[in-house]
């Protein structure tokens, strides 16, 4: 929360520090204040998709360039090439993932959506789309804090949101994401890796499949408190909360926070 107010005060200080302007030059348009933008990748994938490991590597390379905390990837296992968990098999398919797969009319995998702009894109288009998304401006900021209690596997999530402009209507989405999941993955030539390590896997939508409707105001930051119990089998030291604010124009800001800081 303190960081959000620092950003606001910085903008005010800039305005107060301006020199007086001659009347002939008073109507020069000044760019609106903006906040550092992060980018969300919704990576649609599946354990039976032989080309998906290559797509995962492509995302890793992009994150190496931009930073994993700025280019935030979420692997959504969904569709006919995704597999569900059974008593004897670790599957990563989820109902919420299938909901998104159907809603966005994903034709096949691997495909990815970037900040919910441009539709579902093939791997070859990803670098250009990432570059385009980072060049967009935003006036929305999000800070995320997590407090985990081991005894009951409960996490207290504090989400602080702010905007530098007029009121903005949208939805706050909270996702549970997990790293380091050992589960089978199919490769080209039907090669099966039974101990493939899957990262940033979507496990659950914490506050509903489409999030919670909010209105952000420049007058004050908005604080959202959420209590969530981790599902059975989730490793808290490998888990993240991903939070993003979006509306009909796309994702305006995204951030992530580890449930247990190490």
Predicted segments — roles?
Residues 3, 11-40, 44, 50:
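Bacterial Sec-dependent N-terminal signal peptides
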């Amino acid at each position: 929360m303190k960081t959000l107010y620092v950003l606001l005060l910085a903008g005010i200080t800039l305005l107060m520090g301006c020199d007086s302007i001659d009347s002939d030059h008073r109507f020069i348009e000044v760019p609106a204040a903006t906040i550092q933008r992060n980018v969300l990748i919704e990576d649609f994938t599946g354990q039976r998709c032989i080309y998906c490991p290559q797509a995962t590597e492509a995302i890793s390379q992009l994150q190496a360039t931009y930073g994993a905390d700025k280019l935030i990837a979420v692997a959504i296992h969904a569709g006919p090439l995704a597999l569900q968990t059974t008593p004897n098999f670790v599957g990563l398919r989820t109902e919420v993932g299938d909901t998104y797969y159907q809603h966005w009319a994903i034709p096949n995998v691997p495909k990815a959506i970037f900040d919910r702009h441009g539709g579902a894109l093939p791997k070859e288009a990803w670098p250009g789309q990432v570059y385009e998304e980072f060049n967009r401006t935003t006036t929305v900021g999000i800070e995320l804090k997590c407090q985990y209690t081991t005894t009951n596997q409960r996490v207290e999530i504090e989400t602080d949101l702010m905007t530098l402009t007029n009121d903005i209507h949208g939805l706050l989405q909270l996702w549970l994401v997990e790293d380091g999941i050992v589960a089978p993955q199919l490769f080209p030539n039907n090669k099966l890796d039974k101990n493939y390590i899957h990262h940033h896997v979507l496990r659950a939508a914490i506050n509903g499949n489409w999030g919670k409707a909010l209105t952000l105001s420049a007058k004050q930051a908005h604080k959202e408190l959420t209590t969530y119990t981790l599902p059975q089998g989730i490793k808290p030291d490998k888990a993240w909360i991903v939070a993003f604010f979006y509306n009909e124009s796309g994702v305006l800001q995204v951030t992530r926070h580890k449930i247990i800081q190490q």
